[in-house]
């Protein structure tokens, strides 16, 4: 029986292992992008809630003589939003901050509609367009 040539076996094994390592590395980067996006959205929702409390809560609101639906404006300017969460504005994306009334609470929601996971085929579409909220009792 003729002995087979072993040249190139190490390079082939490295290619197989390197593909798995690079896939795991890029998956970790993707999860990191998602985590920093959600954290930035939380910071933006919290800042929007603070701005709303400073600008909207007055004697009538504290005395509950007005409806919470009168305080649903966005009190942050685009420049302030970008200063609070600059990562959200990468690649031309723009986060949205909305305030809605749920019962007797105001809910400030921050979302990033254009965000896409790099490995969406691996994670699915449930992680695209993340959103987070902050509730304020009124």
Give the ranges of each region predicted by the language model:
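Short, conserved structural patches
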Residues: 38, 47-138
């Amino acid at each position: 029986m003729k002995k087979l040539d072993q040249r190139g076996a190490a390079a082939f094994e490295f290619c197989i292992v390197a593909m798995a390592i690079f896939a795991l590395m890029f998956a970790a980067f993707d999860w990191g992008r998602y985590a920093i996006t959600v954290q930035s959205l939380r910071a933006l929702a919290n800042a929007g809630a603070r701005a709303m409390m400073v600008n909207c809560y007055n004697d009538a609101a504290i005395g509950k003589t007005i409806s919470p639906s009168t305080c649903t404006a966005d009190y942050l300017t685009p420049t302030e939003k970008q200063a609070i969460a600059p990562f959200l504005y990468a690649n031309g994306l723009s986060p949205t901050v909305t305030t809605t009334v749920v019962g007797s609470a105001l809910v400030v929601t921050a979302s990033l509609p254009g965000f896409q996971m790099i490995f969406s085929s691996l994670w699915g579409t449930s992680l695209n367009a993340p959103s987070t909220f902050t509730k304020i009792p009124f």
